[in-house]
Amino acid sequence: MQIITDPIQMQAIAEKLRLNRQLIGVVMTMGALHEGHLSLIKEARKIAGTIILTIFVNPRQFAPHEDFHRYPRPFEQDAAHAKAAEVDYVFAPPVDAMYTGNFQTTVHPGPLGEQFEGKQRPGHFSGVATIVTKLLQITRPHIAVFGEKDAQQLAVIKQLVKDLNIDVRIIEAPIIRDENGLAVSSRNIYLSAKERDAATVLYKGLCHAERRIAEPCLDLDAIVPEVENIIKSALSCHPEYICFVDDETFLPASKAEKGKTYRLLLAVQAGTVRLIDNRKFMV
């Protein structure tokens, strides 16, 4: 495994791999690797012969009041995990290598990036879209694997690749959960034992929605307050948004139609930690 920090060097390696007809898969992370990230690497390995793991805590997707400076950066541990997962290249550039002093260009994802997470975190998806575009240009992958955990991010990236005619196939990987149903996340380390226990209401809410839709209940608006009550049953959990969307368009959905797929999106403040989760439903 090679660790590369220079974007120009990484791009040259990727171009050489392509010339040698190597199928490249990329997994983009901000480090603090966990089982969810490792599952993305496994998915990439099913298709690609060469795996590039990117580790970059992107300042442009954090608001000034968010946790950029305290975001975990255990690089040596991450490198060990990457090596054990048989990653071929770790691309871990410094911030000034990705955003030079006169850097001016930003990729704006449009309305898709302005709702839900985009509304709660203005500018977040512009930062995501910009860094994903740059990393795709640098690593030159044939496939890129992203987790369903960040469902709106996945939708933004799919739209970006389509709109900008970027020659890469986006692969979705399922959410990895712990034994209590909590979706694994690098930010889970911020949770106290009490907050972690309380946060299981997110999964309980998603499971309740699944049961209701299976009945079938096609009135999605009727399910939302039921899920809200489940989440609020944990006194430390405060919902920011609970919304069903059409999984194809990502537009809010009030009534379900048979044969279509929907996704329930959750954002919850669990004590001091903000958590997001979601589940997909076929009606």
UniProtKB/Swiss-Prot annotation:
In the record, what terms sit under GO molecular function? Answer: ATP binding; pantoate-beta-alanine ligase activity
- Could you say which EC number(s) this protein's record lists? 6.3.2.1
Q: What is its main location?
A: cytoplasm
> Which family does the UniProt entry place this protein in?
Belongs to the pantothenate synthetase family.
Gene behind this chain? panC
Q: Which SUPFAM superfamilies match?
A: Nucleotidylyl transferase (SSF52374)
Q: Assembly and partners?
A: Homodimer.
The miscellaneous remark of the record is:
The reaction proceeds by a bi uni uni bi ping pong mechanism.
Protein residues bound to ATP: 30-37, 147-150, 176, 184-187
Q: Where in the cell is it found?
A: Cytoplasm
Q: What is this protein called?
A: Pantothenate synthetase
Q: What is known about what this protein does?
A: Catalyzes the condensation of pantoate with beta-alanine in an ATP-dependent reaction via a pantoyl-adenylate intermediate.
Give the active-site positions: H37
| Top-level division of the source organism's lineage | Bacteria
Keyword field: ATP-binding, Cytoplasm, Ligase, Nucleotide-binding, Pantothenate biosynthesis
For this protein's source organism, the top of the classification is: Bacteria, Pseudomonadati, Chlorobiota, Chlorobiia, Chlorobiales
What's its catalytic activity? (R)-pantoate + beta-alanine + ATP = (R)-pantothenate + AMP + diphosphate + H(+)
Q: For this entry, list what GO says about its biological process.
A: pantothenate biosynthetic process
Identify the residues that bind (R)-pantoate. Q61, Q153
Residue sites binding beta-alanine per the record: Q61
